[in-house]
C-alpha cells in the first residue's frame, strides 16, 4: 500500500514541499531564513489577531486601547511587544535572506526573485501601516510625512494624497483604513509566499557554489527539517530576550506621547528598518527626485538579474565581487545610521555620498567588476 502522504491530495502537496523535496546537500545556514520568515509571518498573524480583538481604530481611543492592552489584558504586554519586536525580527531575516540571494546569485531564478521583491514591498507597506496604529506622536507624523511624499507625483499628487487620507489631513478615516489594510495584507503576503515557494520548487534550490546540484540531492526531511528547527529555536530565543529584557530598544520614545497635530516632534524618523531608504530620500534636495530614489532603492533589486555579467553564478569564487558586496553591506549600515541622525553637517554629505555609492555599486561597479573577473580567469 502506498503511503497516504504520497496519495492524499493535500498531503502530497505538503510531502513534495517539506518532506520528500530533493534538496542540495551543501546548502548552508544562509538558506534557513526562508523558513524563519515563515515563522515570523505566523507569529505576526497570531499576535496581530489577538491585538485586533482589543484594539479600536478611532483617533480618540486608539492610543488608550493600546495602553489598555498593555495594562489590563492578560499577557497583553507580551502580545504587544512580541508583535512590535516580531516585526524587527521579520526585517532582520528579510535583509539577510535578500543578502544571501545577492551573494549566491539566487536572483537568477527570475520568477522567484521578482515575487520576492513584491513580497518585500508588501511587508514594508504592512509594517508602515502598523506603525501608524498606536497613534503616538511618531505614528501620526510618520504617516503625515510619508503619505505626503505622494504629492510629489505630477498633476494627480495632491488629489491622490487627499484620497488616501480620506480628508484634508491624517485623521480618523486614515487610521481606520490603515487598520483595515494592515489586517488584510499579511494574508496577501502569505498567499504570495506560497507562490514564491511554488516557483522555487519548479527549479529547486540554489546552493553556495552556484553550480547545478542535480547529481547530489538529499530529502528535505529529516536533514533540513532538523536544521530549520535549530534556526527557529534561535530566532525564538533572540525574540524572547528582546521582548522580556528590552522591549523598547528598537522603538521610539516619542510614540509614548499621544498624537498631537499641533506639536511636531524635533526629529521625525521611521522605524530602524526603513532608515536606509529614508536616508536616501533625504539625501536628494528635490521632492520628486527623493521619492523616485526612495522607490528605486528597493525596486533596483528587480533589475539585479539583468545586471549579472559574470560567467559564474555565485560570489563564492569571486574575491573582488565579495569585497564589493561587503562594501555594499557597510554602505547600507552607514545609510541606516544616517537616517536616524538630524539633517545637519556632516550627516547631509555623508548621506549623499553613501546614497551615490549604493546606486553606483549595484548599477555600475559590480557589473564591471564581474566582467573584469571573467577576463582574469582563463576560460
Curated annotation (Swiss-Prot):
One of its GO terms (biological process) is mitochondrial electron transport, ubiquinol to cytochrome c. One of its GO terms (cellular component) is respiratory chain complex III. Its main location: mitochondrion. It is found in: Mitochondrion inner membrane. Keywords: Electron transport, Heme, Iron, Membrane, Metal-binding, Mitochondrion, Mitochondrion inner membrane, Respiratory chain, Transmembrane, Transmembrane helix, Transport, Ubiquinone. A ubiquinone binds at residue 201. The chain crosses the membrane at residues 33-53, 77-98, 113-133, 178-198, 226-246, 288-308, 320-340, 347-367. Heme b b562 binds at residues 83, 182. SUPFAM superfamilies: a domain/subunit of cytochrome bc1 complex (Ubiquinol-cytochrome c reductase), Transmembrane di-heme cytochromes. Its cofactor is heme b. InterPro entries: Cyt_b/b6_C, Cyt_b/b6_C_sf, Cyt_b/b6_N, Cytb/b6-like_sf, Cytochrome_b, Cytochrome_b_C_euk/bac, Cytochrome_b_N_euk/bac, Di-haem_cyt_TM. Coiled coil: none annotated. Heme b b566 binds at residues 97, 196. One of its GO terms (molecular function) is ubiquinol-cytochrome-c reductase activity. It holds the Pfam family Cytochrom_B_C. Heme 1 (or BL or b562) is low-potential and absorbs at about 562 nm, and heme 2 (or BH or b566) is high-potential and absorbs at about 566 nm. Component of the ubiquinol-cytochrome c reductase complex (complex III or cytochrome b-c1 complex) that is part of the mitochondrial respiratory chain. The b-c1 complex mediates electron transfer from ubiquinol to cytochrome c. Contributes to the generation of a proton gradient across the mitochondrial membrane that is then used for ATP synthesis. Belongs to the cytochrome b family. The cytochrome bc1 complex contains 11 subunits: 3 respiratory subunits (MT-CYB, CYC1 and UQCRFS1), 2 core proteins (UQCRC1 and UQCRC2) and 6 low-molecular weight proteins (UQCRH/QCR6, UQCRB/QCR7, UQCRQ/QCR8, UQCR10/QCR9, UQCR11/QCR10 and a cleavage product of UQCRFS1). This cytochrome bc1 complex then forms a dimer. This is Cytochrome b. It comes from Cryptotis parva (North American least shrew). The gene is MT-CYB.
